């Protein structure tokens, strides 16, 4: 049973991860691979709204996706977007990235190899990773405008969609930790962390929501 205090702290981290960017037309949309097909669905919706003429889906597989997405996250995203009416010619697949940094670097390399001019990117991620994705993208590709979006959901609705409240809170704590650790390792830009967010993070760690934490000397994940 998860207490009301834990839920309140998780909500603070959830809200902090939301960047609050308003989608507008960009040169390209990049959908970051994961277990969550909602990223592909949101990217497809944005395409149909005219927010980007080209989509890059990026991602190999991970320990959480190798069984349900055996052809790779990017390929499963592509298939879902095509099911939703996105033309195959509008989709590029980057199948090798295994972390957020590689998502950005390899997508950039793919677009540059194709000679596609990029001045702005619609970056589509899971709801609890908007800020992490933004900080990584700004570090690795600083000379373009980044507009971060995700599926519009409340925390309770997202937990219901995943079916595992503890896992979602673990992932929130892990995303928050990376915002603090990775800038020191050169993986992200530094962002100010408000005191209430730090307090919520420490409370959740103290309650054992630690399965998605990384050692502070670990490579990027």
Swiss-Prot record:
Keywords: DNA-binding
DNA-binding region(s) in UniProt: 77-96
A Gene Ontology molecular function term of the record: DNA binding
Record's keyword annotation contains DNA-binding: yes
Domain of life (superkingdom): Bacteria
Gene3D superfamilies on file: HUPs
Segments crossing the lipid bilayer: none
UniProt KW DNA-binding keyword: yes
A single Gene Ontology CC term: plasma membrane
InterPro entries hit by this protein: Cell_Envelope_Assoc, DUF218, Rossmann-like_a/b/a_fold
Function: The imp locus inhibits the extrachromosomal maintenance of the streptomyces plasmid SLP1. May function as a transcriptional activator.
PANTHER family according to UniProt: DUF218 DOMAIN-CONTAINING PROTEIN, INNER MEMBRANE PROTEIN, PROBABLE PERMEASE
Family classification: To E.coli YdcF.
Name this polypeptide is given: Uncharacterized protein SCO4629
């Amino acid at each position: 049973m998860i207490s009301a205090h834990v839920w309140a702290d998780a909500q603070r981290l959830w809200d902090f991860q939301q960047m609050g960017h308003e989608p507008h037309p960009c040169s390209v949309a990049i959908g970051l691979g994961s277990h969550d097909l909602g990223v592909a669905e949101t990217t497809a919706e944005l395409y149909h709204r005219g927010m980007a003429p080209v989509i890059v889906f990026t991602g190999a597989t991970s320990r959480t996706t190798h069984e349900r997405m055996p052809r790779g996250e990017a390929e499963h995203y592509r298939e879902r977007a095509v099911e939703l009416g996105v033309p195959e010619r509008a989709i590029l697949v980057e199948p090798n990235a295994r972390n957020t940094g590689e998502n950005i670097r390899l997508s950039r390399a793919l677009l540059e190899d194709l000679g596609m001019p990029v001045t702005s990117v619609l970056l589509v991620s899971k709801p609890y990773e908007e800020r992490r994705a933004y900080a990584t993208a700004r570090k690795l590709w600083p000379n373009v405008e980044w507009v971060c979006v995700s599926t519009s959901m409340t925390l309770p609705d997202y937990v219901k969609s995943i079916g595992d409240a503890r896992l979602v809170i673990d992932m929130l704590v892990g995303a928050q930790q990376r915002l603090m650790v990775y800038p020191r390792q050169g993986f992200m830009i530094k962002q100010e962390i408000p005191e209430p967010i730090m307090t919520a993070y420490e409370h959740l760690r103290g309650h054992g929501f630690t399965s998605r934490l990384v050692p502070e000397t670990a490579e990027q994940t």
